[in-house]
Amino acid sequence: MTNGKLILLRHGQSEWNASNQFTGWVDVNLTEQGEAEAKRGGELLVEAGVLPGVVYTSLLRRAIRTANIALNAADRHWIPVIRDWRLNERHYGALQGLDKAATKEKYGDDQFMEWRRSYDTPPPELADDAEYSQANDPRYADLDVVPRTECLKDVVVRFVPYFEEEILPRAKKGETVLIAAHGNSLRALVKHLDGISDADIAELNIPTGIPLVYEIAEDGSVVNPGGTYLDPEAAAAGAAAVANQGNK
């Protein structure tokens, strides 16, 4: 049987990526650059001959639009798209909407990095009546509890079981699956796929708009640990830019 493929695609640059704000579950749109990144992501899929048969994405427009733009560029606009909240970005709690550089200056490097990159320390909770709360957002009406904050461990807990149950079986059958999601939901997935430790995951940065392809064997194992970026040079530069967020 031919190996299946998982295509991990972080959404293109969003408005708050550009303004260096913590975004989380706030539903901001793509910038023009983000749209171009999504289009280029789809073109890279065509150039590599890696064409998805199904897409999984979040309930946030920056990921949904990235998927749609990439699929149009790859002439795969007709394939099924499944949207689920468990692919959402990590909820950044009371940090949502704050400028990253200003937050780092106010709280110091150590606290900033603990909130941003530690595995199991969430930021302070966001009040239900706060400006950027999702407590009354109709798209989350079926959730027993809408998150008020999350650490990366929380994202692993919500996303990985869904991946194991809904997405991985497709890849094990030889399908090619596009996962259009977010920096931290994809970090959670890569941690799982590559067995990255809780400490080492802090060093992993996912660039926007560049497909990362994992080959999956029939038994569900990863054939190419670490995955393969379809534009390695751009991916390295993009990851470095993500790591630098918070600096003026």
Curated annotation (Swiss-Prot):
Report the active site residues. 11, 89
EC identifiers of the protein: 5.4.2.11
Gene Ontology MF term list? phosphoglycerate mutase activity
**Role according to the record:** Catalyzes the interconversion of 2-phosphoglycerate and 3-phosphoglycerate.
Query: Which InterPro entries does this UniProt record tie to the protein?
Result: His_Pase_superF_clade-1 (IPR013078), His_PPase_superfam (IPR029033), PG/BPGM_mutase_AS (IPR001345), Phosphogly_mut1 (IPR005952)
Binding residues for substrate, per the UniProt record?
10-17, 23-24, 62, 89-92, 100, 116-117, 183-184
UniProt lists the family membership as follows: Belongs to the phosphoglycerate mutase family. BPG-dependent PGAM subfamily.
Q: In which pathway does it act?
A: Carbohydrate degradation; glycolysis; pyruvate from D-glyceraldehyde 3-phosphate: step 3/5
**Which residue spans traverse the membrane?**
none
Protein name as annotated? 2,3-bisphosphoglycerate-dependent phosphoglycerate mutase
* Domain of life of the source: Bacteria
SUPFAM superfamilies linked: Phosphoglycerate mutase-like (SSF53254)
Gene Ontology terms describing biological process? gluconeogenesis; glycolytic process
- Keywords from the UniProt entry: Gluconeogenesis, Glycolysis, Isomerase
Q: Where does the entry annotate site (Transition state stabilizer)?
A: 182
Q: Gene for this protein?
A: gpmA
Q: Which reaction does it catalyse?
A: (2R)-2-phosphoglycerate = (2R)-3-phosphoglycerate
